[in-house]
């Protein structure tokens, strides 16, 4: 792995080069487009196409990147954002020890190791911050993502039945968590 000022140079399992780097406030629009593309697939994100405008989502993302209690990593290839991971931490005393992880990867960059690298980056940040837990929610039929999370040490905590409505159908949410103190060093 080569560390550059703009991030860590990586190679996908299919040989394509990409870079892992911290998110920048200027990534807001590119990340909003990535989310819109994945949202249009209709399977992986809870919001429906058109539910959020690109400018408002770009603004919200920029604010998260600036916030001290969140972390955004970006996967970039040929100048395009092809994936990201976000960890946000609530400021409330009761939950300030927990980071909530969300991840999004462009369809043509899945299954090449980017998800594993993004999750590992989130785990490193959680350790540095002294978090006791990373949690996430995933649709139970997203077997590919679940396999990545389990390989990275996440465990299944439960299922919230009929948690989300999507295209007039109700979908369950699988809750997963990773505990740094219980994890072996990766």
Where are these predicted regions, by residue range?
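A short gly/proline-enriched turn/hairpin at secondary-structure junctions
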Residues: 19, 42-50
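Short glycine/proline-centered loop/turn elements that form peptide/ligand docking sites
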Residues: 115, 119, 141-145, 162-167
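Glycine-rich phosphate/pyrophosphate-binding loop shared by adenosine-nucleotide-utilizing enzymes
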Residues: 16-18, 78-84, 171
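A short beta-loop-alpha structural element at the N-terminal edge
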Residues: 19-33
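Conserved catalytic-core motifs of GNAT/GCN5-like acyltransferases
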Residues: 133-139, 150, 155-171
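Acetyl-CoA-dependent GNAT
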Residues: 3-4, 25, 49-108, 119-121, ...
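Conserved GNAT acetyl-CoA-binding A-motif
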Residues: 119, 126-137
């Amino acid at each position: 792995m080569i560390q550059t000022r703009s991030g860590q140079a990586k190679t996908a399992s299919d040989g394509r080069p990409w870079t892992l780097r911290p998110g920048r406030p200027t990534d807001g629009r590119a990340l909003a487009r990535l989310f819109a593309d994945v949202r249009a697939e209709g399977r992986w994100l809870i919001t429906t196409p058109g539910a959020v405008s690109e400018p408002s989502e770009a603004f919200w993302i920029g604010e998260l990147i600036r916030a001290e209690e969140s972390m955004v990593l970006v996967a970039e290839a040929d100048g395009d954002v092809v994936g990201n991971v976000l960890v946000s931490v609530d400021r409330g005393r009761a939950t300030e020890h927990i980071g909530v992880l969300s991840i999004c990867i462009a369809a043509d960059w899945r299954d090449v190791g980017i998800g594993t690298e993004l999750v590992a980056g989130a785990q490193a940040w959680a350790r540095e911050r002294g978090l006791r837990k990373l949690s996430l929610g995933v649709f139970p039929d997203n077997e590919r993502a679940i396999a990545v999370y389990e390989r990275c040490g996440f465990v299944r905590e439960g299922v919230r039945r009929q948690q989300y409505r999507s295209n007039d159908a109700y979908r369950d949410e699988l809750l997963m968590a990773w505990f740094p103190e219980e994890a072996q060093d990766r």
